[in-house]
Structure formats: C-alpha cells, structure tokens
C-alpha cells in the first residue's frame, strides 16, 4: 500500500516515480570579489587618466590671448639640439628659467585681469566665448608652469623650490627693465614732439 502511494500516474496511464532536482553547488574563492574590485578600480583610473589627457589636449588647442610664447619655443629648440649636440647644462637651465619666468608673468597678468573680466562677464559686456577663452588661458598657464617644474626636477632633482624663486626674480627684473625702456621711449617721443634740447647729462637746455 505504501509503495502504491509513493507512485504517481501520468495522464496517459503510465506511472513514474517522483525525483527531487539535484542542486549543483560550486565553491568560489574568497579572492574573486577582490579581483573584480581591483579590475573596476583600475578601469576607473584608466578612464580618468584618459579623460584628463583629452581635456588637456582640448584646452591646448584653444587660441591664446597672449602673443607667441618665444621662451617656450626657445627652450624646446635648445632641448632638441641637445639630443644631437653637446650643449652645456647651464644653457638648458637658463632657457628653462626664462620659460618659467614667462609663465609667472602671464599668470600674474591673468590674476590682475580676473576681477575686471568677471565684472564685465556678469554685466554682459563680454560674451560666453571670451569668458571661456579667458578660463582656458588660465588653465593653459597652470599646465605650462607645472610642466616647467617637472622639467626642473628632471634636470636637477630637488631644484624645484629654488627654481620657483629664481623664476619670480627674473620676472620682476624683466618687468622693471620693460618699465625703464618704456620711460626712455616716452622721453624720446616728448623730446621730438616738443622740440626739446637735452645735453649729455640728460638735462634740459634753454
């Protein structure tokens, strides 16, 4: 009787015995989740690095509001020459200092202009294009100066701190020199327009 109860019939009259499904279990290593997390982190880092490079390239392709950067071009010309010819390290360092000083000058100029640019933009006196161009220029100068610091560290490890100080001194000395030359030119213009007579000592002759 018990055997009959444990047997079931199908619709066509045949009978079959019930079978429980077999569940197959697989063991997973404890390192598997860690591997997935590691792959995810590496992928995110690679994506972030690629995104930053694309953004830097996009920024560098924007037109500059300054003139051509001769100090930048001169440094890379000397650096390229040093690969084929023997050029003294001091020459390369001097060119890099000049490049760094130009970056400092442009950075100070942009900081000086920033309040006026912000005010003009808020008042609607300048458009979105010029505003973005100004922001792009600020980022370009930051990238340029960071690159000079990396070059300074490559040329002489531990030179960065002194390099920054010397760049600022060069920048200020160049500013004084430009101001002095501007005064001399203004003096020549005034002498010519007013028909003044100046002796060798720089004094006015009656």
Curated annotation (Swiss-Prot):
GO cellular component: cell periphery; endoplasmic reticulum; endoplasmic reticulum membrane; rough endoplasmic reticulum membrane; Sec62/Sec63 complex; translocon complex
Glycosylation sites: 5, 12
Pfam families hit by this protein: Sec66 (PF09802)
InterPro entries documented for this protein: Sec66 (IPR018624)
Keyword Repeat recorded: no
Topological domains, Cytoplasmic: 49-206
Gene Ontology process terms (BP): filamentous growth; post-translational protein targeting to membrane, translocation
Subcellular location: Endoplasmic reticulum membrane
PANTHER family, per database record: TRANSLOCATION PROTEIN SEC66
Role noted for this protein: Acts as a component of the Sec62/63 complex which is involved in SRP-independent post-translational translocation across the endoplasmic reticulum (ER) and functions together with the Sec61 complex and KAR2 in a channel-forming translocon complex. A cycle of assembly and disassembly of Sec62/63 complex from SEC61 may govern the activity of the translocon. SEC66 is required to attach or retain SEC72 in the SEC63 complex. It is essential for growth at elevated temperatures.
Similarity remark: To S.pombe SpBC409.21.
The name this protein goes by in its record: Translocation protein SEC66
Species of provenance: Saccharomyces cerevisiae (strain ATCC 204508 / S288c) (Baker's yeast)
